[in-house]
Amino acid sequence: MTPRRHVLLFMAPFCAECDRARALLERRGIAFEEIDLSADPERCCELEALTGGRSAPQIVIDGRPIGGFAELSALDRAGGVEVAESAMVR
């Protein structure tokens, strides 16, 4: 059994790409922590430290940035986010 990964979804309200990223993770049954950057602006600093930027959405798995919705979607098409999650194991 694959160990559970810590998945963060940095998002903003009224962000269509954020909604798509959330929906993809939910569809795949992947547990994630949703961080609303507008409700917790201090987390913007955390996002910038992890990814080098402040754009939303951003997906981070076990402290490693995956990217935004486009990158998440590409990973899903290439074998599923589940595969990407398990690839994070080192």
Model-derived segments and spans:
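Structural signal for short hydrophobic segments within the conserved structured cores
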Residues: 33-35, 64
